[in-house]
């Protein structure tokens, strides 16, 4: 599958509506193919994970050469302009695009998360943490019509990154430069958005407003909303809602709390708004989601 239509290149502007962007950016995408040289740099609001299986590849990330070694897992926040410049002998490469709100909801090393949101490129110390078989299976399962199978794949990818987090990693590009491309994300914007992401992650379950976020980073609210949407490619309100929905899904799956308690715990203040929002973002009612999750636990016991 090709996710380039969801991305911004250095010589084009993003014209998609925020609502259609959310539907694209909430999805996890996996490509498994031969790498190809990119004619220009591009950027997008997701976390990108690359694993070349049979040879090294070279990227230009924020105008710095980065060698991605065979068998190593490499990840970075893809709002930094990046371009694959040398495919070497590699014929088989996995490319994951992970929604930032999902990445930040997983129990990963806080230093790792901090490095990623501040523009560093991170590489696993160990090789062979992932096989082509797993990548192909996840790619197939993410397109399954069965919600339980799709969620199982997402859970397993989260565990893969948890293993990455625990098994040792190092930064291979520390983003000290301020070079930018025309129409791309400035270092100034990325810095402020990284602060906003941290604040939202800590406070999304409260009565959080856009003004609260803007005040935290000491920016005008309209300016804060503008740079957030430019970097993340969805609105701040959509992002906060996505964090809350992630929390709700976890509590529906893992606890027996009442649905109203769960909604309040995750930061929703109105029962009717919660039901409407959950249905819109997940495609089913909370009751249906809980039932599916319980069935999944019985089908795939931990």
Swiss-Prot record:
Coiled coil: none annotated. SUPFAM superfamilies: A DNA-binding domain in eukaryotic transcription factors (SSF47454), Homeodomain-like (SSF46689), RmlC-like cupins (SSF51182). This is Melibiose operon regulatory protein. Keywords: Activator, DNA-binding, Transcription, Transcription regulation. It comes from Escherichia coli (strain K12). GO terms for molecular function: DNA binding; DNA-binding transcription factor activity; sequence-specific DNA binding. Residues 194-292 form the HTH araC/xylS-type domain. Residues 211-232, 259-282 bind DNA. InterPro entries: Homeodomain-like_sf, HTH_AraC, HTH_AraC-typ_CS, RmlC-like_jellyroll, RmlC_Cupin_sf, TF_DNA-bd_sf, Tscrpt_reg_AraC-type_HTH.
């Amino acid at each position: 599958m090709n996710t380039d239509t969801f991305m911004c290149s250095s010589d084009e502007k993003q014209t998609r509506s925020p609502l259609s962007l959310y539907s694209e950016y909430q999805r996890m995408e996996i490509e498994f193919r031969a790498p190809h040289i990119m004619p220009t740099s591009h950027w997008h609001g997701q976390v990108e994970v690359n694993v070349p299986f049979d040879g090294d590849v070279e990227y230009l990330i924020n105008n710095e050469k980065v060698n991605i070694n065979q068998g190593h897992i490499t990840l970075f926040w893809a709002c930094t302009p990046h371009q694959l410049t040398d495919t070497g002998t590699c014929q088989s490469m996995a490319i994951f695009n992970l929604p930032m709100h999902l990445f930040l909801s997983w129990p990963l090393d806080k230093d790792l998360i901090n490095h990623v949101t501040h523009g560093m490129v991170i590489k696993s110390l160990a090789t062979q943490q992932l096989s082509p078989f797993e990548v192909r299976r996840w790619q197939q399962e993410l397109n399954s019509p069965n919600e339980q199978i799709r969620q199982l794949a997402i859970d397993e990818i989260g565990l893969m990154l948890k293993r990455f987090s625990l098994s040792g990693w190092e930064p291979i590009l520390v983003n000290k430069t301020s070079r930018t491309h025309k129409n791309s994300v400035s270092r100034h914007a990325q810095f402020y958005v990284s602060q906003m992401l941290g604040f939202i992650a800590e406070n999304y379950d409260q009565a959080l407003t856009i003004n609260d976020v803007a005040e935290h980073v000491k920016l005008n609210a309209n300016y804060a909303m503008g740079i957030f949407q430019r970097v993340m490619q969805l609105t701040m309100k959509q992002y906060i809602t996505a964090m809350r929905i992630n929390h709700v899904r976890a509590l529906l799956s893992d606890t027996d709390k009442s649905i109203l308690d769960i909604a309040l715990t995750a930061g929703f203040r109105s029962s009717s708004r919660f039901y409407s929002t959950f249905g819109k973002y997940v495609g089913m009612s909370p009751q249906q989601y809980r039932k599916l999750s319980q069935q999944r636990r019985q089908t795939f016991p931990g």
